[in-house]
């Protein structure tokens, strides 16, 4: 949990700096920063929110099943943060290589998180009745996976291959919001 909180704080500070930079850009003090809107959005969503969720979901799942706090999965943490770093390089430059690589790493980290959560559940000796809330949170992670896939596919133009009709950006935003 602690590494995720450290990264949350880091992304929070960077998001504030990016917001200040946007203000300076708007006032033509630092005009070269135009086009960084989506970078700020992703600092908040990927940086802050994702770090908090990836850090707390395993703990809450273990607590629900009366299991000890799980150890930090450094592989998940590293994949998530390497992916975010690559996305934060690729998004403002619209470079496909860091975007696809970063999206793939975040997708892999999310998949490993789902596997970790399933493993926590199977470690439990007591069988919990399936609750609607659990289905909701599992669906949320799957929507997040869809949002990652669509967001990664925005720049290489995967819309047709993914069967998306209309604005791919809207699909990406709404999938991540539901996730």
Label the model's feature ranges:
Residues 1-179:
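Hydrophobic alpha-helical transmembrane segments of multi-pass integral membrane proteins
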């Amino acid at each position: 949990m602690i590494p995720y909180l450290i990264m949350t704080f880091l992304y929070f500070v960077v998001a504030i700096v990016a917001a200040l930079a946007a203000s300076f850009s708007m006032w033509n003090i630092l005009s070269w920063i135009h086009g960084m809107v989506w970078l700020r959005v992703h600092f908040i969503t990927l940086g802050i929110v994702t770090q908090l969720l990836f850090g707390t979901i395993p703990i809450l799942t273990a607590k629900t099943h009366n299991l000890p706090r799980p150890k930090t999965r450094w592989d998940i943490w590293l994949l998530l943060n390497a992916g975010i770093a690559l996305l934060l390089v690729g998004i403002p430059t619209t470079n496909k290589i860091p975007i696809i690589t970063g999206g793939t790493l975040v997708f892999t980290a999310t998949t490993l998180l789902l596997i970790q959560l399933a493993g926590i559940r199977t470690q439990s000796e007591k069988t919990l009745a399936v609750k609607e809330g659990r289905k909701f949170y599992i669906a949320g992670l799957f929507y997040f996976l869809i949002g990652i896939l669509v967001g990664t596919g925005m720049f290489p133009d995967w819309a047709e291959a993914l069967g998306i009709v209309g604005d791919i950006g809207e699909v990406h935003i709404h999938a991540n919001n539901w996730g």
